[in-house]
Amino acid sequence: MKAYNQTIEKKFYEQYSVTEYCSSTLAGDKKEVTVLGYEIEIPPERNPVRITYYESGWGKEYREKKSELQDKKEFYIENTRGRSSHQYHPFCIIECEDGVIMLLAIAWSGNWYLKITEDGRILTGQTKEMFARVLKAGEVFYSPSVIKAQTEDGNLDSLINHMHGFGRDIWLKHNSESRCLWTEWNHWWTFEDSQINEEVFLSNARAAAELGIELCTLDAGWFGNNRDITWSKLQGDWSHYNRERFHHGIRYLSDAVHKDGMKFGIWMEPEAMGALSELRKEHPEWEALRDGKSYENPYVCLGNKEAEEWLFQAMSSLAEETACDHMKLDFNLDPELGCNREDHGHQKNDGLQAHYEGYYRVLKRLSEKFPHLVIENCSSGGLRTDYGIMKRAHTAFISDVDVSSHSLNCFWHLSMFLPPENILHWAWSQTLEYEDGSHVFESFLIDDKTEESRIKYTIRAAMLHQLGMSRDLTKLSKSCKSLIKEELDFYKIHIRPLLGKGEFYHILRTDGIFAFLIKDREKGYLFLYNTSNIAHQPKLVLKGYNNGHKYRIENIDTGSVQELTGNQLMEQGFLADTIAGETAAIYIVHLVDAL
């Protein structure tokens, strides 16, 4: 037998036009073998001519880039921060000759590279610097998967809906509760950790109940024994509830929220190890080190089996003691190449691989123990969103920054790869004003002076996925509460039932204008957003309609009505009402009859 055998395995999901690829390396039966990285080749049906990919950073997710491939130069990008989406997102669109289009999604939360060679070969994996592992005789290593969706007719929207169907039916995680898409209030941007306490949380929870909000989430600031130490320094002390801020404990908050008919959510950063935490003092042997040195932001290496078991028990205890329905899991640091300690149980050059393998196991066990718990994936916003972690978490938080123009741009791109019901983001937040008068990002304050159209714009910008908000609900006037409740009710009654069931189309993105369509056979909702300061009157060409039917298009705000055939909607389109800056319009598209 050879020293080792390396093969590319693939599984074809014909109904969705999707193929899953992975690499397997089997050591021979005589001696051990060292795997120095791995590489998966994705064979294109035609020669690649263009790639669309996305740069990323905090508050700068989904910065679209395009590269022409006809000049026969090699294309190469890599992610080395240790989080799948920090430098680049692990998603891309590859256009080939003769109308062939591919969507690629890397199912891994750590480092990766993507290469398109001069002769058109598509290669992805990890370099030997990113990953190396010694296999014992007879041992096998399976690489993380890569997902490819492909169409040969050039119809990107059809391909996106196939990708959504594959994610929805085969790959992505869901349970009955995650499909409810609860509307959420989270205290973070308005109060952060410095201003949150028991009374602030409960008073806002009561206001949330009046608005019909269904989930109240307690973010950072609830753990550790000291009010004056920044939350990030105490992470890992998950069993120490901050009694200075929350006199009655966290279960008291949960019970109060449940009594008001809502769900309770709680935030944690499972992998983090606060620099001043009791965890770090008591278990220095679990800390990830690189070349014997601590990380600037320490973390627990889950390549250590004892640490992995501790984390599962800590998360289980938190879920049990707080009776939470939703757990927001964050990760705010870059492990880069990962831990290379040799006393953890993992090998010197596979620490990050072992860490994520351990984290995936923890999430799997947590869901098995708490099958109704909804798990939210967050990492400084959207810096670790990939098909690997989304096989183990129910929803992905788009970005820490939720200014509506940024949210819509991020959603435009992410919703090409993830179904809308697996995405969560907040309407533009009211951010905390710091002592120097600054804000983490521009705040959107709602009061009686705020234009009604701008309030609707910010809420509607969060309607095409799970909708949340972060603001002081107790300070809203009666008229503002009424408007917000009306918008939330519209979302819950009309839009949410289509998420996960309807077809989804990207209609228009130009000059600050975004338009999306979600529809079933009988009715569709067309969302038109103007994020600029200039009024526009765009022509909207729709998709997914029947040529032989007549449709009525009605603006829910102005009442304006047009009637057009399916052929007219998809060939000529219709002229929308003029839309002012920072405004959102919703059109209902009704089926009238067959011609």
What kind of region is each of these model predictions?
Residues M1-G120, E129-A132, Y551-E563:
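Polysaccharide-binding surfaces and accessory modules of carbohydrate-active proteins
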Residues S84-H86, C92-I94, L508-N547, I588:
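Carbohydrate-binding surface patches
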Residues R133-E152, E582-H590:
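Short Pro-Gly-centered flexible turn/kink motifs
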Residues G138, V257, D330, I375, ...:
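Conserved, mostly hydrophobic/aromatic
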Residues S176, C180-S316, H326, E336:
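Aromatic-lined carbohydrate-binding/catalytic grooves of carbohydrate-active enzymes
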Residues G274-E309, Q313, Y356-T474:
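Glycan-recognition surfaces
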Residues I459-Y505:
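Catalytic cores of secreted or luminal carbohydrate-active enzymes
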Residues L564-L595:
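C-terminal beta-strand-rich structural cap/linker in extracellular carbohydrate-active enzymes
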